[in-house]
Design a protein with these regions (language model features):
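Intrinsically disordered, low-complexity regulatory segments
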Residues: 1-142, 148, 152, 239, ...
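Structured, non-catalytic alpha/beta "coupling" segments that mediate domain-domain communication
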Residues: 14-40, 172-220, 327, 335, ...
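Phosphate-interacting basic helix/loop segments used at nucleotide- and nucleic-acid interfaces
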Residues: 56-82, 177-181, 283-284, 381-390, ...
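C-terminal or mid-to-C-terminal helical accessory/interaction module adjacent to the motor/catalytic core
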Residues: 117-200, 268
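Metal- or metallocofactor-binding catalytic centers and their adjacent structured scaffolds
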Residues: 226-273, 442-445
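Short acidic, hydrophobic short linear motifs in intrinsically disordered regions
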Residues: 259-262, 270-284, 309-313, 461-473
């Protein structure tokens, strides 16, 4: 009696196979298996008929077709099928697609938040059915995103003829946030101001306060995971003229100084919550300089290896069992940090799915022990997750805060200091400013002036967003969900709507033009509040409160279809009103210029693209731009000859009969060729697509390497098999 477990990622196969043992077959769908077909009106792949939606699905790729064919054969050999796709809305939808394609009648559905034997066996002991509400929400999201993306791109974006490729429900709202900030920066007018301060012989510095008895709000704010730990220099209340600054300095120098108030208090700083997807991306970006998509890639590998729980979650909950394990760990290793009762953190309103936060599966596997097994990026991210999780279950930190007010004549001066008196959770996660201790002085005491001065400063424009800060903003605005933050940012960069400049996201001219256009023709759709409301409605579908077909058909009928029709009618007028719209059809973004060279592969005029890559000998390269009908070929400057050349791999790319294998490319079905390369000084051979035109584009992931068993294997496509 054999059972089948269906999962998404091949990275879990080995671990789950070890857990389940004999009597089980574990197979991976390799992610999404089906997608909406590119047919029908505007290639939507679905029809809106009254209040119903007729969807037409097709295998996502030739590889997906092959996987489905193999799975159909396996299903015939087993007695029971368990769907164990990822435990979220997306995973539920993939499970439904598998059940549909494999014609499974009421398959078992199991979910687990960690790949460990106890978790997997507990899930198998309590199987359930596929959640139709989650599936409905997943299907609604797919149709909604394609409706907005395909129709908006075809009828609006392409009409700009400026190189912009697409718009999207989440993509365009996120771009709008970046462009709004860029507009604020462009319009910003700096203003001079002065910070006035005094320094005393007793050993502290105080700053001018116009109203000394007006206390600042010191309530504990939510920790900022996107912030890097930098000391914020104190300032006085802003003085707006040199004359007033000079007057205050004169008062300080000509009058005695006396302490009029000393305030001392001890506050408890609560530990931060364990990581959600968003806070992990923020912290990894700030502390490890990881891009959001790279953070998720590393977290995925840690999850698949069984080291951490599922990494797409907006919950800060930890299981009772794990909280008890952390408490036991602290009792054995850091008894002073054991709180009186278990620390519970509240998830934000609207948090989805009954998941745990991102945490280690075994708290006793410390970062030091883990780094002896795995090093590099995985070890660094694991340490971040372990430290944050343990910190979340520790005692609060205790901070002694002091505030001193002095007076000279009619001017008042304030000094603030703080000292950490009990570290608490900061032993593992230090998000508190460094100590700044003030001397022990008494009210009424006369203090001796050492120096008085005014420092001229300028107001600064609002900063551009880093990737962690943008993730934080998307979460706070309700744009997207944990699974969409990093792909959205990646898409904006790939579309050349934004670029990273000194670690900050800056909209390109192309991105600014597109946003300015959409702000006039579809202003609602790019507003954060509008997009957030749509996310809430998708959540309501997931909770069974809304019918997905009625919601989407009415949304299209009542808002999107008329808004799109109106926008299409305004394209020509709005286009003329935009700056830089005198560029010709298909012209490249501002960072690109036409080169006097034609593509050697397709004859299209090459484009000169600026680049800061240290790998290049010049500050640019040539590209056969697909936006203008090119094939994607690139050429680099040979500084010795002064000529542009194809990459070395393509100059030698004409396959010889001897190099062609009997295997076919899984993407374009051309033969795979043997390609020699060196790694660590050793000569090696890999199989790659033999077609130089598709190799840099749609076949770029086709790379098979020889295993110790003599088979050919690819990280993306798995083991290579000869056609039957």
């Amino acid at each position: 009696m054999t059972k089948l477990l269906l999962i998404e990622s091949p990275g879990k196969l080995k671990k789950l196979g070890q857990i389940l043992g004999t009597g089980w077959i574990v197979k991976a769908s390799m992610g999404h298996i089906r997608e909406l077909a590119d047919d029908g009106e505007d290639a939507l792949g679905f029809d809106l008929e009254g209040d119903r939606i007729r969807c037409r699905y097709t295998p996502r790729s030739s590889r997906a077709s092959s996987i489905l064919k193999e799975l159909r054969q396996v299903v015939q050999q087993v007695t029971e099928v368990y769907i164990a796709t990822d435990p979220d809305r997306e995973g539920e939808t993939i499970g439904w697609h598998l059940a549909q394609e494999l014609r499974l009648n009421q398959p078992f559905r199991i979910t687990y938040n960690e790949i460990s034997k106890p978790a997997v066996m507990a899930a198998l002991a309590n199987p359930k059915t596929l959640d139709q509400n989650l599936i409905a929400a997943g299907r609604a999201r797919d149709c909604l995103d394609k409706l907005v993306g395909y129709k908006g791109s075809k009828h609006l974006v392409w009409a700009l003829n400026n190189g912009a490729k697409s718009m999207g429900r989440v993509q365009s709202a996120t771009l709008h946030l970046l462009c709004q900030r860029e507009t604020e920066i462009i319009r910003f007018v700096p203003q001079d101001y002065w910070s006035v301060w005094v320094e005393y012989v007793e050993g502290f510095k105080a700053f001018y306060r116009a109203k000394w008895n007006e206390k600042k709000d010191e309530t504990s704010s939510e920790p900022d995971d996107a912030a890097t730990k930098t000391d914020v220099l104190p300032e006085s209340d802003r003085v707006t003229s040199q004359a007033e600054a000079d007057r205050l300095v004169a008062i300080a120098k000509s009058n005695p100084h006396q302490i009029v108030q000393v305030e001392k208090k001890t506050i408890n700083q609560s530990p931060p919550a364990p990581f959600t997807t968003s806070s992990l991306q923020q912290a990894a970006g700030a502390k490890l300089r990881f891009a959001p998509e790279f953070t998720m890639k590393v977290a995925q590998s840690l999850f698949e290896a069984g080291y951490i729980t599922y990494m797409r979650t907006d919950s800060v909950m930890l299981s009772d069992q794990f909280c008890a394990a952390v408490r036991q760990y602290l009792e054995q290793n850091d008894s002073d940090n054991v709180p009186a009762k278990v620390t519970r953190h509240r998830s934000k309103a609207g948090a989805q799915e009954a998941h745990e936060a991102i945490r280690p599966t075994d708290v006793y596997l410390t970062p030091e022990q883990f780094s002896s097994r795995v090093n590099g990026d995985e070890a660094n991210l694991y340490q971040l997750i372990w430290n944050r999780t343990v910190a979340s279950q520790c005692r609060a930190a205790q901070i002694a805060k002091t505030r001193i007010i002095t007076q000279s004549g009619t001017a008042f001066w304030e000094a603030r200091g703080q000292v950490l008196i009990f570290p608490g959770y900061t032993v593992y996660w230090n998000n508190i400013s460094d100590d700044s201790e003030l001397p022990n002085v008494q009210q009424g005491q006369v203090v001796n002036l050492k120096q008085a001065a005014a420092e001229k400063k300028q107001t600064q424009p609002p900063p551009r967003y880093t990737e962690p800060k943008l993730v934080q903003l998307m979460e706070r605005k309700g744009i997207g969900r944990p699974s969409t933050y990093s792909p959205t940012i990646k898409t904006l960069k790939e579309r050349q709507y934004v670029e990273l400049v000194k670690g900050k996201l800056q909209p390109t001219q192309l991105g600014m033009e597109l946003d300015a256009f959409l702000a006039q023709v579809l202003p609602d759709l790019i507003a954060a509040e509008f997009t957030a409301k749509m996310e809430q409605e998708l959540d309501a579908i997931a909770q069974g409160k809304l019918n997905w077909e009625r919601y989407l058909t009415s949304w299209n009928r009542d808002y999107f279809a008329p808004a799109l029709a109106k926008a299409v009618g305004e394209v020509a007028k709005v286009k003329r009103s935009l700056p830089n719209q005198n560029r010709g059809k298909g012209s490249a973004p501002s960072s690109q210029k036409q080169a006097d060279i034609q593509c050697p592969n397709c004859g299209v005029q090459m484009t000169k693209v600026s680049s800061k890559s240290q790998k290049l000998k010049a500050d640019h390269f040539l590209s056969c731009d697909r936006q203008t009908g090119g094939c994607g070929t690139v050429m680099f400057l040979n500084v010795k000859s002064g000529n542009y050349e194809l990459p070395l791999s393509e100059r030698k790319s004409a396959p010889t009969p001897e190099s062609l294998s009997e295997y076919s490319c899984p993407v374009c079905h051309n033969p795979l060729e043997a390609y020699e390369y060196s790694k660590d000084g050793q000569a090696k051979v890999m199989l790659r697509c033999c077609n130089p035109k598709t190799r840099p584009s749609k076949c770029k992931d086709v790379a098979f390497f020889k295993t110790k068993q003599g088979n050919w294997w690819s990280p993306k496509f798995g083991e290579l098999k000869l056609p039957k």
